[in-house]
Amino acid sequence: MPSIRAPAAKKTTTLTVAVKCRPLMEKERGRDIVRVNNSKEVVVLDPDLSKDYLDRIQNRTKEKKYCFDHAFGPESTNKNVYRSMSSVISSVVHGLNATVFAYGSTGSGKTYTMVGTRSDPGLMVLSLNTIFDMIKSDKSSDEFEVTCSYLEVYNEVIYDLLEKSSGHLELREDPEQGIVVAGLRSIKVHSADRILELLNLGNSRRKTESTEMNGTSSRSHAVLEIAVKRRQKNQNQVMRGKLALVDLAGSERAAETNNGGQKLRDGANINRSLLALANCINALGKQHKKGLAYVPYRNSKLTRILKDGLSGNSQTVMVATISPADSQYHHTVNTLKYADRAKEIKTHIQKNIGTIDTHMSDYQRMIDNLQSEVSQLKTQLAEKESQLSIKPFERGVERELSWLDGLSHQISENVQDRINLQKALFELEETNLRNRTELQHLDDAIAKQATEKDVVEALSSRRQVILDNIRDNDEAGVNYQRDIEENEKHRCELQDMLNEAINNNGNKTYLHILNQYKLLGMGNTELQFEMAMRDQIIYNQREAQRNLWNLLMGLGVEEKQVFDLAAKQGITIEDWSSIALFPGLPYRKQTPSFIPANIPFVGHSYSKSSCTFQSYQDPSSKGQQWAPTPTLCREEHHSSYYFMRQEPPAFVNLRKSHDGWVGGSRPASRIDTGGNHRRVSYPQTVNNSSPRMASGPTFYQTPQREMLLNTTSPYSSPRVGLINGATTPSVQPFYGSPRAVTVRNGSYNTPLAPAAVSTKGARNQQRVFGTSPLSGTKGVKNSSYGQNSHTKLYRGGGTKGHSKGNNTQRQHQ
């Protein structure tokens, strides 16, 4: 595992927005309508000069005024623009991230600003010179390493501009590095001239076309990334900085460019990705004024690449380029409108500091990637050699295989799109859940402050904002559902194509196997996605518990004070650190005053090799019968715990002790005559402060859905006890850690009715009951692995049980 030092405190900063107006070109027959005042204010005049006197005196004009961090007129050069952001570029050498991107319509001067010419070099060239000048002038003994990569996004497909024949590249999410492009070539460089050579090489491979709006229009988005590693010679420390320079393609209108065919499709894809970027800027800008809002990063690959630059760990500069011509009034105003909203976006920056272990792990990763690349090249070479010796009559088979490969690629893209849509829908629902929680808190606050009009008005205003966000998110969710339905229709079409190929081709066995393989691959990918989502939720819940406990300890609050205060509020806190006071003995063994005479002592041990908790009974306990030992099983790939036993579960009894409410077990009353129903006794009196159980025998109906220990006695005679004051044996959780704390806050105002359990067939078949951390997630199922039985949990509490094979039915009131 790489070793990472605790990062320094995060610093919150806003986007730096600069506006550059290009000069008026000779072919533009019109007047200049843009004015730059005091290097900060931009005024766009009304392009219509024919308005009558009444319109002018009534101030009905299209004139617009904006203020930005920096504003540059037509006479400014790229060096003037660069001086305003040079401090951001220099911070890359000291372990910080920086992003610079140009935004504007086609022909407004984005590529000129970023790349420039020999006489007026652009921001990319000037940034590279600054980085290497700082490395050369550094007087410390630190070692520097600079790498460069260059990619383009063309028609929502990523290509490597440093590779002669680059294939399609995919985006991946790395837990340490964030969004990365799999297979992107990164070249080690030692001077700015070398990077300029690579930049010119990449620009020669970049997609450009001539349109009526721009003679050299960029048809793709380009991202030049410079990574700087700084290693201190006498210390075990590495700092990593990253500079991303982005040249976006310009938005365009089909009516103005008169494009057709491929150019028209390219323009549509460019506008689509820029619209996704504009929506992200709008959502991020709203968060400063209206609070929590969903940001649709997944709508485009461009926005996913720029995610860190827009809201992550990066200092970001946005250069908005505009045209002064009156014919470009609408494009100019739209660009300035989005630039004005971008001023509200905030990012959180911190130094990227690691240790030498991280440095060495990067080399190991590079070695693994090179070995994988060598293996792929060998495979491709073998395929090429076999193709050279192919016979003419086999070319038909080759065409069929090529068609199958293309169909396979479409299936993979269909599955990946579905996963992305499901992820986006999941994030949207999570955002709405937090909004509804805040809405509930606002309603409670309004009810408490009914007499304070000013406070109620402020809370009501905030409540309306939250309702608007919920409504917007619901509309976005409907759109995602529609996209998922269209994706499913496309999947059915692909399936029909495969079935048709199977019916029309003579080699039906091979095609049928291929079809099944692709379908299994699709199902496996979706299952991996569901598992990843559930693991993420488990991790978030555990982090929340750990942070809560660390917060209490950091404030100097003692555990006894926490327990006393929680007991007064009706909250139960179980400290799992007191599970085993003495090794080898269960907790109940060490409290003899609470032990009934005929209940054996049961302990639990964990086997790391088999990933199971094995229960055992103390042979010195009173009693003459031995019950089958239950087992607590953990499925490695599900990270969930399942309690396995031979008997049906009895209810969990609760008692009130000095530590609050704890669980106790009572045996179920049973009538074991053949064919008769078994009866399970549930408590008839429950205190209001005790947690409420859900309809299943092993579930709490609380927001946390924590699993409570549920055991049965091997003896047939029931012991009747009271809830309050009964001296029942305390039951501790199966697994414990010194810092693990479970907080439950539940209430139950009505008595629980008796529950009947009827069985048919075999009595002692093994059954499994379990819970999942995903019980609150819509559409995600939880299966307990046992003999023909499983349990599903749904949002809002409650369970739905299904059983197969043993005809078991449960009825609960």
Curated annotation (Swiss-Prot):
GO terms for cellular component: microtubule. Residues 682-694, 761-791, 804-813 have a biased composition (Polar residues). GO terms for biological process: microtubule-based movement. Keywords: ATP-binding, Coiled coil, Microtubule, Motor protein, Nucleotide-binding. It comes from the Eukaryota. GO terms for molecular function: ATP binding; microtubule binding; microtubule motor activity. Residues 349-391 form a coiled coil. ATP binds at G104, S105, T106, G107, S108, G109, K110, T111. Residues 14-345 form the Kinesin motor domain. The keyword Acetylation does not apply. SMART domains: KISc. Residues 664-694, 756-813 are annotated as: Disordered. Belongs to the TRAFAC class myosin-kinesin ATPase superfamily. Kinesin family. KIN-8 subfamily. PANTHER family: CENTROMERE PROTEIN E, KINESIN-LIKE PROTEIN. This is Kinesin-like protein KIN-8B. It comes from Arabidopsis thaliana.
